[in-house]
Amino acid sequence: GKTVQEGGAVYNFTGPQGFGIANMADSLYAIRQLVYEEKKFTMEELKEALAWNYGKGLDEQSVKEITTGILREMTESGAKVDADTAAAVLKSVMNAQMAPEKMARYQEIHDMIAEVPKFGNDIPEVDYFARDVAYTYTRPLQNFKNPRGGQYQAGLYPVSANVPLGGQTGATPDGRYAHTPVADGVSPSAGKDVNGPTAAASSVAKLDHFIVSNGTLFNQKFHPSALSGREGLEKFVALIRSYFDQKGMHM
């Protein structure tokens, strides 16, 4: 045989991971319904609401962008910009207060988004929308080769990275507040699957798990009392069997 260094490896693939599919799907679905179909608010209003974290204040990235913009304008106008000036501008932006009517509007936008159907409730229109959204990552990846000339095989599981990644991510159009965890693997966003575990499993099973050859991960949490006794065990087994009968991958 050959060593790995001599080209003896049997498998030659790289498996990059994607996650937050539910956030992406719920965000785009909310935009389609509220901005383009019902015209409840504009994209510009939504961008402002996100920058202000739905009324909870500017997020860190927005503070940096606004501060940089102000300093750039000052420099272009010929004003002297030193470290003290930059610090003063940064402090001013961080202390900026939102007008009460703006804060109320951003909260109203958040409330409207909360009422939009979400992935994880066995609603075909939403679930197949999520399936198409996942394809925007999985299909293009097939067109590239890794540095060794092998395949890229898409994966959709976070290994808990959804928590630190969410901590670095601003507010999203699905109603998620800045710096909170994004969705875990292919699971629905936390608290958004309100029709029970069977409905959530049916939604996740509608994703194309075959194309995600590096694996998907569907996580669910149960209170022990929900699975207690013989009846609880039988229900748990039925849920798992149903998920795999629908071509789910990893639960």
Language-model-detected regions and their locations in the chain:
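Acidic, glycine-enriched catalytic cores built around paired aspartates
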Residues: G1-M251
